[in-house]
Amino acid sequence: MEKKKIVILGAGESGAGAAVLAKAKGYDVFVSDSGAIKDKYKTIFSENKIAYEEKQHTMEKILQADEVIKSPGIPSKAPVMKKIYEKKIPVSGEIEFASRYTKSKMIGITGTNGKTTTTLLTHHILTKAGLKAGLAGNVGHSLAMMVAQDPRDYYVLELSSFQLDDMKTFKADIAILLNITPDHLDRYPSFENYIDSKFSITRNQTSADAFIYCEDDLVIAENLSQHNISAQPYPFSIKKKTIPGAYLDNNEIIINLKNHQNPTFTMSIHNLSLQGRHNIYNSMAAAVAANILNIRKEVIRDCLSDFRNAEHRLEHFATVHGVDYVNDSKATNVNSTWYALESYHRPVILILGGVDKGNDYSILKDLVCEKVKAIVCLGKDNKKIHKAFKDCVKMIVDVSSADEAVATASGLATKGDVILLSPACASFDLFENYEDRGRQFKRAVKAL
Protein backbone atom coordinates (compact mmCIF):
# COMPACT_ATOMS: atom_id res chain seq x y z
CA MET A 1 0.00 0.00 0.00
CA GLU A 2 1.31 3.45 -0.92
CA LYS A 3 2.21 5.67 2.04
CA LYS A 4 0.01 8.70 2.69
CA LYS A 5 1.78 11.90 1.70
CA ILE A 6 2.05 14.75 4.20
CA VAL A 7 3.44 18.12 3.16
CA ILE A 8 4.58 20.48 5.90
CA LEU A 9 4.68 24.19 5.11
CA GLY A 10 7.12 26.14 7.26
CA ALA A 11 10.28 24.61 8.72
CA GLY A 12 10.53 26.28 12.11
CA GLU A 13 10.00 24.68 15.54
CA SER A 14 6.44 23.49 14.85
CA GLY A 15 7.17 22.35 11.28
CA ALA A 16 10.24 20.35 12.30
CA GLY A 17 8.28 18.67 15.11
CA ALA A 18 5.35 17.83 12.83
CA ALA A 19 7.77 16.37 10.25
CA VAL A 20 9.49 14.11 12.80
CA LEU A 21 6.15 12.86 14.19
CA ALA A 22 4.68 12.28 10.69
CA LYS A 23 7.80 10.31 9.70
CA ALA A 24 7.61 8.27 12.92
CA LYS A 25 3.98 7.44 12.12
CA GLY A 26 4.89 6.08 8.68
CA TYR A 27 3.91 8.98 6.40
CA ASP A 28 5.78 10.03 3.27
CA VAL A 29 6.92 13.52 4.43
CA PHE A 30 8.02 16.59 2.45
CA VAL A 31 8.83 19.95 4.10
CA SER A 32 8.66 23.21 2.13
CA ASP A 33 9.65 26.69 3.35
CA SER A 34 9.57 29.88 1.24
CA GLY A 35 12.41 31.29 3.38
CA ALA A 36 15.80 29.98 4.52
CA ILE A 37 15.75 27.04 6.95
CA LYS A 38 17.91 27.25 10.10
CA ASP A 39 20.80 24.77 10.28
CA LYS A 40 19.47 23.08 13.43
CA TYR A 41 16.25 22.12 11.60
CA LYS A 42 18.16 20.97 8.49
CA THR A 43 20.13 18.65 10.77
CA ILE A 44 16.87 17.23 12.19
CA PHE A 45 15.53 16.62 8.66
CA SER A 46 18.76 14.95 7.52
CA GLU A 47 18.97 12.72 10.61
CA ASN A 48 15.36 11.61 10.12
CA LYS A 49 15.72 11.21 6.31
CA ILE A 50 13.03 13.83 5.65
CA ALA A 51 12.99 15.54 2.25
CA TYR A 52 12.83 19.34 2.32
CA GLU A 53 13.21 22.47 0.22
CA GLU A 54 13.94 26.09 1.20
CA LYS A 55 13.46 29.53 -0.38
CA GLN A 56 10.68 28.18 -2.61
CA HIS A 57 7.40 26.26 -2.77
CA THR A 58 7.35 23.62 -5.54
CA MET A 59 3.60 23.53 -6.15
CA GLU A 60 3.73 20.33 -8.19
CA LYS A 61 5.06 18.45 -5.11
CA ILE A 62 2.89 20.29 -2.58
CA LEU A 63 -0.36 19.59 -4.44
CA GLN A 64 0.32 15.82 -4.35
CA ALA A 65 -0.27 15.87 -0.57
CA ASP A 66 -3.04 13.88 1.12
CA GLU A 67 -2.81 16.41 3.95
CA VAL A 68 -0.98 19.70 4.51
CA ILE A 69 0.27 20.80 7.93
CA LYS A 70 0.92 24.54 7.86
CA SER A 71 2.82 26.87 10.14
CA PRO A 72 0.51 29.23 12.07
CA GLY A 73 2.49 32.13 10.58
CA ILE A 74 1.20 31.41 7.05
CA PRO A 75 -2.07 33.28 6.43
CA SER A 76 -4.95 31.43 4.73
CA LYS A 77 -4.92 34.01 1.93
CA ALA A 78 -1.27 33.30 0.98
CA PRO A 79 -1.02 32.21 -2.71
CA VAL A 80 0.28 28.74 -1.75
CA MET A 81 -2.71 28.20 0.57
CA LYS A 82 -5.25 29.37 -2.04
CA LYS A 83 -4.03 26.64 -4.42
CA ILE A 84 -4.18 24.01 -1.66
CA TYR A 85 -7.75 25.00 -0.74
CA GLU A 86 -8.76 25.01 -4.43
CA LYS A 87 -7.60 21.38 -4.65
CA LYS A 88 -9.58 20.62 -1.44
CA ILE A 89 -6.54 19.13 0.32
CA PRO A 90 -7.20 18.89 4.10
CA VAL A 91 -5.16 21.43 6.10
CA SER A 92 -4.19 21.11 9.78
CA GLY A 93 -1.84 22.76 12.24
CA GLU A 94 0.96 21.09 14.19
CA ILE A 95 -0.99 21.07 17.49
CA GLU A 96 -4.02 19.48 15.80
CA PHE A 97 -1.83 16.84 14.12
CA ALA A 98 0.12 16.02 17.33
CA SER A 99 -3.06 15.73 19.42
CA ARG A 100 -4.17 12.73 17.30
CA TYR A 101 -1.28 10.69 18.68
CA THR A 102 -1.57 11.33 22.42
CA LYS A 103 -4.15 10.72 25.13
CA SER A 104 -2.36 13.02 27.59
CA LYS A 105 -4.21 15.83 29.40
CA MET A 106 -4.24 19.10 27.45
CA ILE A 107 -4.31 22.50 29.17
CA GLY A 108 -4.85 25.13 26.47
CA ILE A 109 -4.32 28.83 27.24
CA THR A 110 -5.31 31.71 24.98
CA GLY A 111 -6.17 35.41 25.15
CA THR A 112 -4.83 38.56 23.54
CA ASN A 113 -2.48 39.30 26.45
CA GLY A 114 -0.91 37.33 29.29
CA LYS A 115 -0.81 33.97 27.46
CA THR A 116 2.92 33.37 27.83
CA THR A 117 3.03 34.36 31.51
CA THR A 118 0.02 32.20 32.41
CA THR A 119 1.32 29.24 30.38
CA LEU A 120 4.77 29.39 32.00
CA LEU A 121 3.25 29.83 35.47
CA THR A 122 0.85 26.88 35.00
CA HIS A 123 3.70 24.69 33.73
CA HIS A 124 5.85 25.80 36.68
CA ILE A 125 3.14 24.68 39.14
CA LEU A 126 2.62 21.29 37.44
CA THR A 127 6.35 20.59 37.26
CA LYS A 128 6.92 21.59 40.91
CA ALA A 129 4.04 19.29 41.87
CA GLY A 130 6.00 16.39 40.34
CA LEU A 131 3.77 15.93 37.30
CA LYS A 132 5.42 15.03 34.00
CA ALA A 133 4.36 18.14 32.08
CA GLY A 134 5.46 19.48 28.71
CA LEU A 135 5.44 23.12 27.62
CA ALA A 136 4.45 23.72 23.99
CA GLY A 137 2.53 25.78 21.46
CA ASN A 138 3.68 29.38 21.16
CA VAL A 139 6.26 28.88 23.92
CA GLY A 140 8.61 26.01 24.83
CA HIS A 141 9.06 23.08 22.45
CA SER A 142 7.06 21.62 19.59
CA LEU A 143 4.16 19.50 20.85
CA ALA A 144 4.59 17.10 17.93
CA MET A 145 8.31 16.63 18.70
CA MET A 146 7.52 15.81 22.35
CA VAL A 147 4.75 13.37 21.38
CA ALA A 148 7.21 11.69 18.99
CA GLN A 149 10.32 11.61 21.17
CA ASP A 150 9.64 12.58 24.79
CA PRO A 151 5.96 12.01 25.70
CA ARG A 152 4.51 13.70 28.80
CA ASP A 153 1.35 13.05 30.86
CA TYR A 154 0.27 16.70 30.67
CA TYR A 155 0.85 19.37 28.05
CA VAL A 156 0.50 23.07 28.87
CA LEU A 157 -0.08 24.87 25.57
CA GLU A 158 0.04 28.57 24.76
CA LEU A 159 -2.35 28.87 21.82
CA SER A 160 -2.52 31.85 19.47
CA SER A 161 -5.65 32.55 17.45
CA PHE A 162 -3.76 31.36 14.35
CA GLN A 163 -3.08 27.98 15.98
CA LEU A 164 -6.71 27.69 17.11
CA ASP A 165 -7.86 28.43 13.53
CA ASP A 166 -6.07 25.30 12.31
CA MET A 167 -7.77 22.97 14.82
CA LYS A 168 -10.81 20.80 14.15
CA THR A 169 -10.67 17.77 16.48
CA PHE A 170 -8.28 19.06 19.20
CA LYS A 171 -9.83 19.12 22.67
CA ALA A 172 -8.56 20.96 25.75
CA ASP A 173 -9.28 19.14 29.02
CA ILE A 174 -8.78 22.54 30.66
CA ALA A 175 -9.26 25.66 28.49
CA ILE A 176 -8.26 29.12 29.73
CA LEU A 177 -9.44 32.33 28.02
CA LEU A 178 -7.76 35.35 29.63
CA ASN A 179 -9.08 38.34 27.66
CA ILE A 180 -10.00 39.50 24.15
CA THR A 181 -8.99 42.89 22.76
CA PRO A 182 -8.55 43.93 19.10
CA ASP A 183 -5.36 42.40 17.65
CA HIS A 184 -4.18 40.85 14.36
CA LEU A 185 -6.93 42.70 12.54
CA ASP A 186 -4.63 42.57 9.51
CA ARG A 187 -5.31 38.78 9.43
CA TYR A 188 -9.05 38.74 10.30
CA PRO A 189 -11.89 40.28 8.26
CA SER A 190 -13.46 41.68 11.45
CA PHE A 191 -13.10 41.80 15.24
CA GLU A 192 -16.01 39.29 15.42
CA ASN A 193 -13.94 36.74 13.49
CA TYR A 194 -11.06 37.20 15.93
CA ILE A 195 -13.45 36.76 18.90
CA ASP A 196 -14.80 33.52 17.38
CA SER A 197 -11.23 32.33 16.91
CA LYS A 198 -10.44 32.85 20.61
CA PHE A 199 -13.65 31.13 21.74
CA SER A 200 -12.82 28.11 19.57
CA ILE A 201 -10.53 26.94 22.41
CA THR A 202 -13.75 25.50 23.89
CA ARG A 203 -14.50 23.48 20.73
CA ASN A 204 -14.99 19.73 21.35
CA GLN A 205 -15.03 20.19 25.16
CA THR A 206 -17.54 18.09 27.12
CA SER A 207 -19.16 18.49 30.54
CA ALA A 208 -16.18 16.56 31.98
CA ASP A 209 -13.83 19.38 30.94
CA ALA A 210 -13.17 22.82 32.46
CA PHE A 211 -13.44 26.30 30.94
CA ILE A 212 -11.65 29.01 32.96
CA TYR A 213 -12.32 32.58 31.83
CA CYS A 214 -12.14 36.21 32.94
CA GLU A 215 -15.58 37.41 34.01
CA ASP A 216 -14.37 41.04 34.04
CA ASP A 217 -13.47 41.06 30.34
CA LEU A 218 -16.37 42.81 28.59
CA VAL A 219 -15.82 41.12 25.22
CA ILE A 220 -15.80 37.65 26.82
CA ALA A 221 -18.87 38.46 28.94
CA GLU A 222 -20.81 39.81 25.94
CA ASN A 223 -20.00 36.83 23.72
CA LEU A 224 -20.29 33.90 26.15
CA SER A 225 -23.94 33.17 25.37
CA GLN A 226 -23.28 33.13 21.62
CA HIS A 227 -20.96 30.13 21.93
CA ASN A 228 -22.26 26.70 22.75
CA ILE A 229 -19.93 25.81 25.64
CA SER A 230 -20.36 22.35 27.19
CA ALA A 231 -17.48 22.49 29.69
CA GLN A 232 -17.86 23.26 33.40
CA PRO A 233 -17.38 27.07 33.72
CA TYR A 234 -14.90 28.53 36.24
CA PRO A 235 -14.95 32.36 35.95
CA PHE A 236 -12.37 34.52 37.73
CA SER A 237 -12.87 38.15 38.72
CA ILE A 238 -11.36 40.91 40.82
CA LYS A 239 -14.66 42.83 40.84
CA LYS A 240 -17.23 40.34 42.08
CA LYS A 241 -17.67 37.05 43.90
CA THR A 242 -17.67 34.10 41.50
CA ILE A 243 -18.43 30.61 42.86
CA PRO A 244 -17.36 28.18 41.53
CA GLY A 245 -14.28 30.08 40.35
CA ALA A 246 -11.85 32.65 41.75
CA TYR A 247 -12.34 36.17 43.09
CA LEU A 248 -10.67 38.86 45.18
CA ASP A 249 -11.73 39.67 48.72
CA ASN A 250 -9.72 42.15 50.88
CA ASN A 251 -6.62 41.65 48.69
CA GLU A 252 -6.93 37.87 49.10
CA ILE A 253 -7.34 35.56 46.10
CA ILE A 254 -10.15 33.16 47.00
CA ILE A 255 -10.62 30.05 44.89
CA ASN A 256 -13.75 28.01 45.42
CA LEU A 257 -14.43 25.14 43.04
CA LYS A 258 -17.63 23.99 44.73
CA ASN A 259 -21.03 25.67 44.97
CA HIS A 260 -20.64 26.52 48.66
CA GLN A 261 -18.87 29.02 50.90
CA ASN A 262 -15.78 27.01 51.93
CA PRO A 263 -12.77 28.19 49.93
CA THR A 264 -10.56 25.63 48.20
CA PHE A 265 -7.56 27.98 48.31
CA THR A 266 -6.65 31.47 49.61
CA MET A 267 -3.58 33.67 49.15
CA SER A 268 -2.72 37.34 49.66
CA ILE A 269 -1.95 39.25 46.45
CA HIS A 270 0.99 40.85 48.30
CA ASN A 271 2.73 37.45 48.22
CA LEU A 272 2.46 37.06 44.43
CA SER A 273 5.79 37.25 42.61
CA LEU A 274 4.01 38.91 39.67
CA GLN A 275 2.58 42.29 40.60
CA GLY A 276 0.08 44.48 38.74
CA ARG A 277 -3.63 43.95 38.13
CA HIS A 278 -3.15 41.91 34.94
CA ASN A 279 -0.88 39.51 36.83
CA ILE A 280 -3.54 38.93 39.51
CA TYR A 281 -5.71 37.65 36.65
CA ASN A 282 -2.88 35.50 35.27
CA SER A 283 -2.15 34.07 38.73
CA MET A 284 -5.84 33.34 39.34
CA ALA A 285 -6.20 31.49 36.04
CA ALA A 286 -3.15 29.30 36.68
CA ALA A 287 -4.21 28.64 40.28
CA VAL A 288 -7.75 27.58 39.28
CA ALA A 289 -6.27 25.12 36.74
CA ALA A 290 -3.92 23.74 39.41
CA ASN A 291 -6.78 23.36 41.89
CA ILE A 292 -8.87 21.50 39.30
CA LEU A 293 -5.91 19.09 38.96
CA ASN A 294 -5.91 18.64 42.78
CA ILE A 295 -2.37 19.97 43.19
CA ARG A 296 -1.51 20.60 46.85
CA LYS A 297 -2.22 24.12 48.13
CA GLU A 298 1.34 24.54 49.48
CA VAL A 299 2.82 23.81 46.05
CA ILE A 300 0.49 26.32 44.33
CA ARG A 301 1.25 28.98 46.95
CA ASP A 302 5.03 28.46 46.63
CA CYS A 303 4.86 28.65 42.84
CA LEU A 304 2.77 31.83 42.80
CA SER A 305 5.31 33.49 45.09
CA ASP A 306 8.59 32.27 43.51
CA PHE A 307 7.79 32.34 39.77
CA ARG A 308 10.09 34.32 37.48
CA ASN A 309 8.50 35.66 34.30
CA ALA A 310 9.64 34.98 30.75
CA GLU A 311 12.39 36.91 29.01
CA HIS A 312 10.99 39.97 27.14
CA ARG A 313 7.83 40.12 29.27
CA LEU A 314 8.14 42.96 31.82
CA GLU A 315 11.65 41.69 32.49
CA HIS A 316 13.46 43.94 34.96
CA PHE A 317 16.89 43.77 33.35
CA ALA A 318 19.13 46.24 35.17
CA THR A 319 19.36 49.32 37.38
CA VAL A 320 21.96 51.85 36.22
CA HIS A 321 22.53 55.08 38.23
CA GLY A 322 19.17 54.61 39.97
CA VAL A 323 17.24 54.12 36.70
CA ASP A 324 15.43 50.79 36.10
CA TYR A 325 15.59 49.29 32.60
CA VAL A 326 12.66 47.00 31.75
CA ASN A 327 12.47 44.79 28.66
CA ASP A 328 8.84 44.26 27.63
CA SER A 329 9.62 43.63 23.96
CA LYS A 330 6.90 40.97 23.80
CA ALA A 331 4.33 43.79 24.08
CA THR A 332 3.41 43.74 20.39
CA ASN A 333 -0.03 45.35 20.80
CA VAL A 334 -1.48 48.40 22.54
CA ASN A 335 -3.15 46.42 25.33
CA SER A 336 0.12 44.77 26.36
CA THR A 337 1.69 48.22 26.68
CA TRP A 338 -1.35 49.40 28.69
CA TYR A 339 -0.77 46.52 31.15
CA ALA A 340 2.92 47.38 31.39
CA LEU A 341 2.30 51.07 32.14
CA GLU A 342 -0.38 50.15 34.65
CA SER A 343 2.28 48.24 36.66
CA TYR A 344 4.46 51.32 37.36
CA HIS A 345 3.97 54.14 39.85
CA ARG A 346 7.13 56.10 38.97
CA PRO A 347 7.95 58.36 36.00
CA VAL A 348 8.39 56.30 32.82
CA ILE A 349 10.41 56.95 29.68
CA LEU A 350 8.59 54.80 27.15
CA ILE A 351 10.28 53.24 24.12
CA LEU A 352 7.44 52.74 21.67
CA GLY A 353 6.95 51.88 18.00
CA GLY A 354 7.61 49.42 15.18
CA VAL A 355 5.22 47.89 12.66
CA ASP A 356 1.76 49.21 13.50
CA LYS A 357 -1.00 46.54 13.23
CA GLY A 358 -3.81 49.10 12.94
CA ASN A 359 -3.20 50.36 16.50
CA ASP A 360 -5.62 52.62 18.33
CA TYR A 361 -3.31 54.58 20.66
CA SER A 362 -6.20 56.43 22.32
CA ILE A 363 -6.49 53.49 24.77
CA LEU A 364 -3.07 54.47 26.16
CA LYS A 365 -3.63 58.21 26.32
CA ASP A 366 -4.75 58.55 29.97
CA LEU A 367 -1.93 56.35 31.28
CA VAL A 368 0.68 58.06 29.10
CA CYS A 369 -0.48 61.52 30.25
CA GLU A 370 -0.33 60.37 33.88
CA LYS A 371 2.93 58.39 33.93
CA VAL A 372 5.14 59.04 30.88
CA LYS A 373 7.58 61.94 30.86
CA ALA A 374 9.13 61.20 27.43
CA ILE A 375 8.59 58.85 24.48
CA VAL A 376 11.39 57.42 22.38
CA CYS A 377 9.98 56.20 19.03
CA LEU A 378 11.75 53.09 17.73
CA GLY A 379 10.36 52.48 14.26
CA LYS A 380 10.51 53.58 10.63
CA ASP A 381 7.16 55.36 10.61
CA ASN A 382 6.16 57.07 13.87
CA LYS A 383 3.64 59.68 12.65
CA LYS A 384 0.69 58.01 14.44
CA ILE A 385 2.55 57.97 17.77
CA HIS A 386 3.47 61.67 17.49
CA LYS A 387 -0.12 62.55 16.62
CA ALA A 388 -1.58 60.47 19.48
CA PHE A 389 0.60 61.84 22.30
CA LYS A 390 1.83 65.31 21.23
CA ASP A 391 -0.68 66.97 23.60
CA CYS A 392 0.41 65.18 26.76
CA VAL A 393 4.14 64.37 26.40
CA LYS A 394 6.57 67.26 25.98
CA MET A 395 9.40 65.20 24.55
CA ILE A 396 8.93 62.67 21.69
CA VAL A 397 12.13 61.62 19.95
CA ASP A 398 12.62 59.40 16.86
CA VAL A 399 15.47 56.86 16.78
CA SER A 400 16.37 54.02 14.41
CA SER A 401 18.20 51.44 16.52
CA ALA A 402 18.12 49.85 19.98
CA ASP A 403 21.50 51.47 20.81
CA GLU A 404 20.16 54.90 19.91
CA ALA A 405 16.91 54.27 21.83
CA VAL A 406 18.75 53.33 25.04
CA ALA A 407 21.27 56.19 24.74
CA THR A 408 18.47 58.73 24.15
CA ALA A 409 16.25 57.37 26.94
CA SER A 410 19.09 57.28 29.48
CA GLY A 411 19.97 60.88 28.57
CA LEU A 412 16.38 61.91 29.41
CA ALA A 413 16.15 59.89 32.64
CA THR A 414 16.84 60.93 36.22
CA LYS A 415 17.25 58.78 39.32
CA GLY A 416 14.07 56.89 40.21
CA ASP A 417 12.75 56.74 36.61
CA VAL A 418 11.84 53.59 34.68
CA ILE A 419 12.99 53.16 31.08
CA LEU A 420 10.42 50.80 29.61
CA LEU A 421 10.74 49.10 26.23
CA SER A 422 7.09 48.23 25.57
CA PRO A 423 6.64 48.92 21.85
CA ALA A 424 2.90 48.14 21.26
CA CYS A 425 3.98 47.13 17.74
CA ALA A 426 5.50 44.24 15.82
CA SER A 427 9.27 44.39 15.30
CA PHE A 428 9.81 43.47 11.66
CA ASP A 429 10.87 46.91 10.41
CA LEU A 430 14.15 47.10 12.33
CA PHE A 431 14.53 43.64 13.96
CA GLU A 432 14.18 39.94 13.13
CA ASN A 433 11.47 39.46 15.79
CA TYR A 434 10.53 40.67 19.28
CA GLU A 435 13.26 38.47 20.86
CA ASP A 436 15.92 40.11 18.71
CA ARG A 437 14.51 43.55 19.65
CA GLY A 438 14.60 42.66 23.38
CA ARG A 439 18.13 41.26 23.22
CA GLN A 440 19.45 44.28 21.33
CA PHE A 441 17.85 46.51 23.98
CA LYS A 442 19.56 44.52 26.77
CA ARG A 443 22.92 44.59 24.96
CA ALA A 444 22.64 48.37 24.67
CA VAL A 445 21.80 48.65 28.40
CA LYS A 446 24.77 46.43 29.26
CA ALA A 447 27.02 48.71 27.22
CA LEU A 448 26.09 51.63 29.51
Regions found by a protein language model. Give the residues of each.
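Nucleotide phosphate-binding/pyrophosphate-handling subdomain across enzymes
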Residues: 2-5, 15-25, 132, 267-373
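N-terminal leader/targeting and accessory segments in enzymes
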Residues: 1-93, 97, 275, 387
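Phosphate-binding loop of NTP-binding sites
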Residues: 4, 23-24, 59-63, 72-215, ...
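Residues in the short beta-alpha loop(s) of Rossmann-like NAD(P)-binding domains
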Residues: 12, 35, 139, 216-217, ...
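Short internal beta-strands
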Residues: 28-34, 211-215, 351-352, 371-380
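Beta-strand->loop->alpha-helix junctions that form or flank phosphate-binding loops
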Residues: 55-56, 92-96, 229-248, 303-305, ...
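C-terminal helical cap/extension that packs against the catalytic core
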Residues: 42-43, 362-417
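Short beta-strand "acidic-cap" motif of Rossmann-like dinucleotide-binding folds
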Residues: 29-33, 134-135, 156, 235, ...
